[in-house]
């Protein structure tokens, strides 16, 4: 299971604050958030306290993160995924990247989310 699969499972779980266990004390982050397809977006930046406040402000009911692709090398992890309602309807697409510290926690975190584009899942080679 990738870093982001574990992180988002905690964030989307019954206690989203457990996701902070994946976050270094001195984290720096930016979240670029678009609600619609009009090109307007909002940026959230800060450290661990601001990330906690972002969790406080979010309505986590009825939707979750779904990682479509994940990878990494040299302490950098990324994930391409979707936020989806519980009925499977796509809300938006996200691309997340993090640099991990020596303990495997988020040190730098950047994510962009938009409903304006969707990616097709990769075909599965059953041979």
Specify the residue positions occupied by each region the protein language model found.
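A beta-strand edge to alpha-helix "cap/lid" segment located at domain peripheries
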Residues: 52-127
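Aromatic side chains
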Residues: 7-8, 22, 29, 54, ...
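A solvent-exposed, acidic/Ser-Thr-rich amphipathic alpha-helical stretch
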Residues: 17-73
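Short, aromatic-enriched amphipathic alpha-helices that serve as compact interaction elements
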Residues: 1-15
């Amino acid at each position: 299971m990738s870093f982001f699969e574990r992180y988002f499972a905690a964030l989307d779980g019954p206690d989203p604050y457990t996701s902070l266990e994946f976050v270094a004390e001195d984290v720096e982050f930016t979240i670029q958030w678009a609600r619609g397809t009009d090109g307007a977006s909002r940026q959230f930046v800060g450290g661990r306290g601001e990330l906690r406040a972002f969790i406080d402000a979010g309505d986590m009911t009825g939707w979750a993160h779904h990682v479509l692709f994940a990878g990494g090398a040299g302490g950098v992890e990324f994930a391409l995924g979707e936020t989806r309602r519980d009925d499977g309807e796509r809300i938006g697409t996200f691309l997340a990247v993090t640099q991990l510290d020596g303990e495997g926690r988020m040190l730098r975190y950047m994510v962009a989310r938009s409903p304006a584009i969707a990616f097709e899942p990769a075909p599965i080679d059953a041979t």
